[in-house]
Design a protein with these regions (language model features):
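Macromolecular interaction modules
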Residues: 1-101
Length: 101
């Protein structure tokens, strides 16, 4: 599952990225490990004030049931204070690992 993450207007990007890495990432990592997810990748924009999206998050599961269990298990951690949920794009897709491992 891939998320193009849109920040709320007038967000402090340094504080947002700090929260994302220090609070949200450990929460997602713990939940991924609990439900059998096998990869989690976060990319932050190098120029978020000029980009449409502040970052990208990729969560990898062996099958769709992992995503279902993740959604049922993840605990709120304040990320909603930073993210424009209506502007975020979510792609639930089948992944093929190709290229450089």
């Amino acid at each position: 599952v891939s998320f193009l993450v849109k920040a709320l207007a007038q967000v402090d990007y340094a504080a947002f990225f700090d929260h994302w890495l220090r609070v949200h990432v450990p929460n997602v990592k713990k939940t991924m490990e609990k439900v059998g997810g096998f990869r989690y990748v976060v990319s932050h924009s190098i120029d978020p004030e000029q980009e449409q999206y502040a970052g990208l998050a990729e969560l990898y599961f062996h099958d769709a049931s992992g995503w279902d269990e993740y959604r049922d298990t993840i605990e709120p951690d304040g990320m909603e204070a930073w993210v424009d949920g209506t502007g975020m794009l979510v792609l639930r897709g089948q992944t093929e690992m190709v290229g450089i491992p």
